UniProtKB/Swiss-Prot annotation:
It is found in: Cytoplasm. PROSITE patterns: G_OBG (PS51710), GTP1_OBG (PS00905), OBG (PS51883), OCT (PS51881). GO terms for molecular function: GTP binding; GTPase activity; magnesium ion binding. CDD domains: Obg (cd01898). This is GTPase Obg. SUPFAM superfamilies: Obg GTP-binding protein C-terminal domain, Obg GTP-binding protein N-terminal domain, P-loop containing nucleoside triphosphate hydrolases.
Amino acid sequence: MFVDQVKIYVKGGDGGNGMVAFRREKYVPKGGPAGGDGGKGGDVVFKVDEGLSTLMDFRYQRHFKAARGEHGMSKNQHGRNAEDMVVKVPPGTVVIDDDTKQVIADLTEHGQEAVIAKGGRGGRGNTRFATPANPAPQLSENGEPGKERYIVLELKVLADVGLVGFPSVGKSTLLSVVSSAKPKIADYHFTTLNPNLGMVETEDGRSFVMADLPGLIEGAHEGVGLGHQFLRHIERTRVIVHVIDMSGLEGRDPYEDYVTINKELEQYNLRLTERPQIIVANKMDMPDAEENLKAFKEKLTDDYPVFPISAVTRQGLRDLLFEIADRLETTPEFPLYDEEDMAENRVMYKLEDEEAPFEISRDPDGTFVLSGAKLERLFKMTDFSRDESVKRFARQLRGMGVDDALRARGAKDGDTIRLLEFEFEFID
């Protein structure tokens, strides 16, 4: 089964917790703190595997969580970093953040990797908090939570050439006679529901990958007839081969078909019009085909080459394949996404987090609710079982201006403050 879109959940591993420990050794009085740091959590890494061709595996496993780092130990022993979770994806996979709809990674080459969810750093042990004023600190940090997000995976097939056109114009038949691909062929519309790839080789030894894409209909750019699902596979092709049925057996006007399909391509993605297009007048072995082709050329205003062929009798295929190979030699690849934009979307903590470290809202019951990525991160890294850790967290809140902001919002002694699932009293 061909699967080309799926939504999954990924989470980097949490960092290991830091340790509160002290050196206890004979003849060494007041040995001092000796708690080690926690290890880093594992990253969730996507890696391209050219042996895969579909996202089928993700239908059965939709949650990916990397291992957490090992906790710190006594004698200043640091916890081991967790191994990364490597998830294999097929070439042509686009990773999109489900919340922001921004592209995180475009994975096209075998072995290419991208960190999708970064693991948290390990918490610091009490050795890190020793100062002249507090040489034996009773506090440590919990590990930093790993990044978590819902993402959408889209598979856009990797092909040099894309066959486009209305249903039943002969795209699958054409692919089957110029390559060893065996697409399903029948005399009804939408026989092809999934892209079929075939390797084509010309007589002079040049080769390229051709994709038979499912038939399009009017309104495809708006999703009509599974249009979005089909159109996404055209985006990576360098040359578009527009197959048109010249027989007129279904009562359609070949030129109207041509105009309709090109309009759908343009409205789906304007950049598709930048690609070279070759018009294939198919089914020239049928009785009215020559007359229809003549009328088509009279109406055609675009400067695209027209190749009359018959996929069934193989008439005209040699010249067509040579033209496609020639066009590919002079046509560069069309990158779908900007590399810098994708790199920015993979960053864990952006500048915006520093500009707005917290927000304050108020529930109907009068409770003040604190939120914000930085604030929640500090909260999760605090060990509330130790008084010194709690006091440190209170100092951090004051340093961030939380106390002053609460007073400005009208908070008074005894008011309830909520942060995530934790509630505490405001003391002025």
